[in-house]
Amino acid sequence: MSGEWQPRTLLGRLVVEGKIKSIDEVFARNMPIREVEIIDTLLPGLKSEVLSVGFVQRQTDSGEVSQYQVTVAVGNEDGYVGVGMGKSRQIGIAIEKATRRAKLNIVPVRRGCGSWECLCGEPHSIPFKVEGKAGSVKIELIPAPKGVGLVASDVAKTVLRLAGIKDVWSRSYGETRTTHNMAKAVYEALKKTYQFYSPDQW
């Protein structure tokens, strides 16, 4: 793939030249990811799942135009996850757009064992309680002991599984049937695991 890809950004060039060899380095340097090929190169085993397919209409000068609206989640099931939305009159293009956006939105997720009931020290849950919000949806993710599983809605479970989380409790509020907002709220909560330090990192 590197032979065909002509990078347009500094980060892309560093990846092609082999000066950056891992996705961890990208986030350690706080460099923005603007090319999907960077993700394809550094996270080749990425999995994607279509979370929702809807139909939306918008008004144009020539009348109403109907489009597919798709939400996709991507992850390597080992600490990286992204969520994206795409719209198009063709379902295949909408899925492709959503997948590209999800890849560009990919973030690292800090895993741990934050439950006082467990304390096994393995990265099966999250290190501390986090919350995320999108639209009217708010979700709280709470560390759970080993064996509890993912106590969450199906949409939240998919995003958590793609991030590599195996055990978590959750509480959600608002219009939780809105798939995109639910997925985005979980994504926003998981982002916070990386933004804040847990006591063992002080």
Curated annotation (Swiss-Prot):
Residue ranges of the TM segments: none
Domain of life assignment: Archaea
BP GO annotations: translation
Domain (S5 DRBM): residue spans on this chain: 46-109
MF terms (GO), sorted A to Z: rRNA binding; structural constituent of ribosome
GO cellular component: cytosolic small ribosomal subunit
Database matches in Gene3D superfamilies: 3.30.160.20, 3.30.230.10
Keywords: Ribonucleoprotein, Ribosomal protein, RNA-binding, rRNA-binding
Family assignment from sequence similarity: Belongs to the universal ribosomal protein uS5 family.
Family matches, as HAMAP family: Ribosomal_uS5_A
Assembly mode: Part of the 30S ribosomal subunit. Contacts protein S4.
Function, in words: With S4 and S12 plays an important role in translational accuracy.
Matching NCBIfam families: PRK04044.1, uS5_euk_arch
Domain notes: The N-terminal domain interacts with the head of the 30S subunit; the C-terminal domain interacts with the body and contacts protein S4. The interaction surface between S4 and S5 is involved in control of translational fidelity.
Stated name of the protein: Small ribosomal subunit protein uS5
Organism, as annotated: Thermofilum pendens (strain DSM 2475 / Hrk 5)
Gene: rps5
